[in-house]
Amino acid sequence: MAETAVIDPPHATEPTSLPTESADPSGPAPSDENALTQPSESAVTATTDADGTQKKTKKIIRRKRRPARPQVDPATLKSEPPPQTGTVFNIWYNKWSGGDREDKYLSKHAAPSRCNIAKDSGYTRADKVPGSYFCLFFARGVCPKGHECEYLHRLPTLHDLFNPNVDCFGRDKFSDYRDDMGGVGSFTRQNRTLYVGRIHVTDDIEEVVSRHFAEWGQIDRIRVLTSRGVAFVTYTNEANAQFAKEAMAHQSLDHNEILNVRWATVDPNPLAQKREARRLEEQAAEAVRRALPAEFVAELEGRDPEARKKKKIEGSFGLEGYEAPDDVWYARTKELEDARKAGQLEAPEQHLMIEPAPSSSSAALPSQSEDTGIFSNSTVAALRGLAGGNVTTQKAPVNSGGPLVAYGSDDDSD
């Protein structure tokens, strides 16, 4: 009797159970059509036959993404008015105005919850809608809808592109930043740097900031002012910076501090400005590489020696010692490629094997047409064929000189 054993590959992790039921028995079970497949995992299966030979087969296991779980219980959500700190309540801004001015930093309250990407992320209804925005309450860790939410419950990636006048949550940006550099931000420039203040000062402050903020996306660089408890975190993607700003607002790191997360102003350091200009140049160069043909890009970057030889031979256009400029050579190459593509799209023209015989009327006409009057010979022949041959032509009269012919002048200047 054959024996079967499953051998996990060395790099495979411990398999996780598939979510077959919701955590809440009363909640609906996730359907197969809503589930999105994750990258497949493989396992090696060893089978021993009766004769003792062992076979190894590779088994592909496709796992489904779990549904997004509710982060808070909807029954615990309460809409309480803010404490009275003034004399007039503004219903539009939901706060009090007037009275004694309070300290805007000491009056901050810690966030009630925090998003846990490893446990809270999953598929929602927004995964079926292209161009959906991310859930703001999910980033803050207080979304009660779970997989029934109309927004995305995951981290932004490089493939999530939005209009420059809105952020990743779908909120409209403004032409300028607020005075405190908070809020949504501005659409005048791409800001990927966050200002993080009120950090508890320790010796390992850079490691603590990196560990907590790396959860929200890939970090480009971190600059820490240890003595002041301030850090500047720069992400590689602007959408991740927007997500991290909302996720870490009023949160704490390893101590009980309440963070002050804002947008960073323009760095006055010349090295930082050069670094940003170099990054923009690299983005422009990447856009040019995608627009040009791959052969031409490889030739410009010197990665294709055969292309250099081809340009040296064919780029002279038959003129010895002539080297065509890059724009001329590229225009000629593009023209040939367009002609080749047009030839592939259009059907080839079929040549006729038998030429059509000339018509009797055209055969009777002389090979040379002489203008003997107002109409040419071919026109007269056509008119004769229509009128039955009763067409007469006359030559155009020669204009006479008139009374001024042989006119003599008495002036001696003749």
Swiss-Prot record:
Region: Disordered, residue numbers: 1-86, 351-372, 390-414
PROSITE patterns named among the record's database cross-references: RRM, ZF_C3H1
GO MF annotation terms: pre-mRNA binding; U6 snRNA binding; zinc ion binding
Pfam families listed in its UniProt record: RRM_1, Torus
SMART domains found in the cross-reference section: RRM
Name used for this protein in its record: Pre-mRNA-splicing factor cwc2
Organism: Aspergillus fumigatus (strain ATCC MYA-4609 / CBS 101355 / FGSC A1100 / Af293) (Neosartorya fumigata)
GO BP of this protein: mRNA cis splicing, via spliceosome; positive regulation of cell cycle; positive regulation of RNA splicing; spliceosomal snRNP assembly
Assembly with partners or alone: Associated with the spliceosome.
Comment field on protein domains: The C-terminal RRM domain and the zinc finger motif are necessary for RNA-binding.
InterPro entries named among the record's database cross-references: Cwc2/Slt11, Cwc2_RRM, Nucleotide-bd_a/b_plait_sf, RBD_domain_sf, RRM_dom, Torus, Znf_CCCH, Znf_CCCH_sf
Keyword Nucleus found: yes
PANTHER family: PRE-MRNA-SPLICING FACTOR CWC2, PRE-MRNA-SPLICING FACTOR RBM22
Gene, per the UniProt record: cwc2
